[in-house]
Regions:
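Hydrophobic residues in well-ordered beta-strands that form the structural core
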Residues: 122, 143, 201-203, 277, ...
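PLP-dependent enzyme catalytic core of the Aspartate aminotransferase-like
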Residues: 346-347, 361-397
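Conserved core of the PLP fold type I
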Residues: 57, 62-198, 208-223, 297, ...
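Conserved core segment of the aminotransferase class I/II
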Residues: 222-295
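Conserved PLP-binding catalytic core of the aspartate aminotransferase-like
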Residues: 315-348
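Conserved glycine-rich beta-strand-loop-beta hairpin in the small C-terminal domain of fold type I
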Residues: 278, 295-305, 317-330
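N-terminal small-domain helix-loop-helix segment of the aminotransferase-like
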Residues: 10-101, 282-283, 350, 393-397
Length: 397
């Protein structure tokens, strides 16, 4: 029997991230700036090992039976407490879902709210899964032009005038793939447009706790006076990606609808990982742990920026992240980026082409994402020396 799949579930465009991973596997000396994994040395391995031991041996039967669909109660309590106390979010009329990482939410939100033909507004280059999850529901993942401060409000308003918009998807802190952080004034402009056109905002903030420079900027959710923001967070980037624990906080009515769909499609997520995260949060000074994570990431980011400034062509630009995991390298428009990519790969340096992150309507782009979290400082310096020399070869001094 042959199966005919609808176009909406077919991924569009090449998977450049997978290509870099597969071509680099087993290659001696390959330095990858392509894979967006957390830094291994930032994961509190011994603390997590101890938490697993305590959770499994304290009450094993509680892990071996069905549990609450909405998630572990203690983890939800600790998460909500941090959202309210640290991030100044108002819990009145709100609900919380514990999810299988923040990634699961990228699928659940469109399934819950989109009709075929609805438009979702997002940065022209943004997280690949956010783009495809909208497309998979028959929606249009419409890319909005950006500048050094993120999404341009006037461009967003032009798109919103179609009347087909449902929500705005944003990673306002240390955006993936660009590393850009949206200033407070810009956030308020975006919020005003959402209010004017009755759009809700999906604020995806998996990197928000990893600020290693500059001042804290309030979340959209913290000034959400009209109850139109869904705030997604994750413990993947701060504790462990493999535990797959995230959360969504927002208007109770919407949260209840998303929870119902989650129950029917994914059921209960594993209790053991939730209880391990709750145990870790109860047993350590989480803020002190975050300071260590930030220190690790700052050291690596500084190594990347310093090596770029030392070795790269003056005609190539690199964003200056103040947190998170990524930087965005933009080439002159006359450079053949496909040839540049292949040359980098042949020199054992992996980078990701901007096409991997292109939303609907995005320009061709002449940029690459660089992730600085996995390589060592020595590997970063060596890789950027190679990359920098190639930028001069392709672009001139």
């Amino acid at each position: 029997m042959s199966f005919s799949l609808p176009e909406r579930v077919t991924l569009k465009g090449p998977n450049f991230i997978r290509e870099v991973f597969e071509r680099g596997v087993g290659v001696e000396g390959f330095i990858s700036f392509g894979i967006g994994n957390p830094a291994p040395e930032a994961i509190p391995v011994e603390v997590i090992e101890k938490a697993f031991d305590e959770v499994v041996h304290s009450n094993p039967m509680s892990l071996l039976q069905y549990g609450p669909m909405q998630g572990d109660a203690r983890l939800a309590e600790l998460t909500l407490e941090r959202l309210v106390k640290t991030h100044k979010m108002n819990p009145e009329g709100q609900g919380l879902i514990i999810s299988n990482g923040a990634g699961q939410l990228l699928g659940l939100v469109p399934i819950t709210v989109l009709e075929p033909g609805d438009e979702v507004y997002m940065d022209e280059f943004t997280f690949t899964s956010a783009i495809n999850s909208v497309r998979n529901m028959g929606g249009k993942a419409l890319g909005i032009k950006t500048d050094e401060y993120g999404m341009i409000p006037s461009e967003l308003e032009k798109a919103a005038q179609s009347g087909k918009g449902k929500y705005i998807y944003l990673i306002p802190n240390f955006q993936n793939p660009t590393g850009i952080t949206m200033p407070l004034e810009r956030r308020k402009e975006i919020y005003a447009i959402a209010s004017k056109y009755d759009l809700f905002i999906y604020e995806d903030d998996p990197y928000g706790e990893i600020r290693f420079a500059g001042e804290y900027i309030p979340t959209f959710k913290s000034f959400d006076t009209e109850n139109r923001v869904l705030y997604a967070g994750s413990y993947s980037k701060t504790l462990s990606a493999g535990l797959r624990v995230g959360f969504l906080f927002g208007p109770a009515k919407v949260i209840e609808a998303i929870q119902a769909l989650k129950n029917n499609t994914a059921g209960q997520m594993p209790l053991v990982t939730q209880k391990v995260v709750a145990n870790v949060l109860d047993s350590i000074d989480y803020d002190a742990h975050l300071e260590n994570v930030r220190k690790v990431y700052k050291t690596k980011c500084d190594a990347l920026l310093n090596a770029f400034n030392k070795y790269a062509s003056s005609k190539v630009k690199l964003t200056q992240p103040t947190g998170g995991m990524f930087a965005w390298m933009t080439m002159p428009e006359d450079v053949d980026c496909d040839e540049f990519f292949e040359t980098c790969m042949n020199r054992n340096v992996g980078i990701i082409k901007c096409g991997a992150f292109a939303a609907d309507g995005a320009g061709e782009g002449h940029a690459f994402r660089l992730s600085y979290t996995v390589p060592t400082v020595e590997e970063i310096t060596k890789g950027m020396e190679i990359l920098g020399a190639l930028t001069k070869e392709f672009c001139g001094e």
